Curated annotation (Swiss-Prot):
GO CC term (a single one): eukaryotic translation initiation factor 3 complex, eIF3m
Organism encoding this protein: Aedes aegypti (Yellowfever mosquito)
SUPFAM superfamilies for the chain: WD40 repeat-like
Protein name: Eukaryotic translation initiation factor 3 subunit I
Primary location recorded for the protein, binned into one broad class: cytoplasm
Record-stated family: Belongs to the eIF-3 subunit I family.
Domain of life: Eukaryota
GO molecular function: RNA binding; translation initiation factor activity
Subunit structure: Component of the eukaryotic translation initiation factor 3 (eIF-3) complex.
Any one of the GO BP annotations: formation of cytoplasmic translation initiation complex
Length: 326
């Protein structure tokens, strides 16, 4: 497996996403420029210029025409993917931590941090006709986290009727958007949920937590199905679209790396069997924790974004497909 190294970001990667076809990778970092790359050869197509702070999150819609990003400059921006121009900017009361397009692409959701006297809030906005007036439009729905802890990751549920949120205290909650109320919550994790990703059919989700585990949940009932244990915080986890495999990435938090032995760092991505919960492979690469992981939609490669500012695309060898789990 010879990886592609995508060099271009000056600071740590915060999130990476493939588009639906998998020909493009979108990456955000703690520098101010979200980037788009060809996944096949690693060529950078361009950057989306306009943010004034670290960009925490990114999502691309189903047709790869629009991009949404959330930043520490207290704004969420919508972009035209083809031209790189800003379609609209939504001011926030604090840093935007998560952004997601709904499956239909008609709506988007974003959440803001609990900071500067403001509670953590979740917004649903209509993005069918986006122009500069979106900054003055009121959201379709606003949910305030009064008792709940801060939202750190978010997904849309089935048929755009629900939103699933992962929180700083390790809880995962599912919200009914029509009734604007919480349907269910589980507390299987003990620490911060760093990332959640759906399976390709949307029936399951994998969560990555600072408590050194990743867990597989039913995306409707939030029943915990499987647990993948490691000995270090998990920053990101993804489910293979073609095999019963889960890949985990993580490591120490960046600020703690120097104070631990190198052995405890373990910055490789680790493959677990989805059903048997057993680790069967590791792939080295990054000089620091992996912050974000994504499988290519065809399942033949995957990408990792690290604290070192690189995005690495790993294409699987033939031996990966021949591998039989004993």
């Amino acid at each position: 497996m010879k990886p592609l190294m995508l060099q271009g970001h000056e600071r740590a990667i915060t999130q990476i996403k493939y588009n639906r076809e998998g020909d493009l990778i979108f990456s955000t970092a703690k520098d101010h420029k979200p980037s788009v790359w060809f996944s096949l050869n690693g060529e950078r197509l361009g950057t989306f210029n306009g943010h004034q702070g670290a960009v925490w999150c990114v999502d691309v819609d189903w047709t790869t025409t629009r991009l949404i990003t959330g930043s520490g400059d207290m704004s969420t921006k919508l972009w035209d993917v083809e031209t790189g121009s800003v379609l609209g900017t939504i001011p926030c009361n604090s840093a935007a931590r998560t952004v997601n397009f709904s499956y239909s692409g008609n709506q988007a959701s974003y959440s803001t941090d609990k900071a500067m006297g403001h509670n953590c809030e979740l917004f649903i906005i209509d993005v069918r006709n986006v122009d500069s007036s979106i900054s003055n439009q009121s959201p379709v729905l606003k949910l305030t986290m009064n008792q709940q802890s801060k939202i750190t990751s978010m997904l849309w549920g089935a048929l755009d009727e629900t939103v699933i949120t992962g929180h700083e205290n390790g809880s995962i909650r599912i919200w009914d958007l029509r009734a604007a109320k919480e349907l269910n919550s589980v507390n299987d994790h003990t620490l911060n949920i760093n990332d959640m990703q759906l399976s390709s059919d949307g029936t399951m989700l994998v969560s990555a937590s600072k408590d050194a585990t990743a867990k597989l949940f039913d995306s409707e009932s939030l029943m915990c199905l499987k647990t993948y244990k490691t000995e270090r915080p998990v920053n990101s986890a993804a489910i293979s679209p073609i095999h019963e495999h889960v890949v985990l990435g993580g490591g120490q938090e960046a600020m703690e790396v120097t104070t631990t032995s190198t052995k405890a760092g373990k910055f490789d991505s680790r493959f677990f069997h989805l059903v048997y919960e057993e680790e069967f492979a590791r792939v080295k690469g990054h000089f620091g924790p992996i912050n974000s992981l994504a499988f290519h939609p065809d399942g033949k490669s995957y990408a990792t974004g690290g604290e070192d500012g690189f995005v690495r695309v790993q294409v699987f060898d033939a031996s990966y497909y021949d591998f039989v789990f004993e």
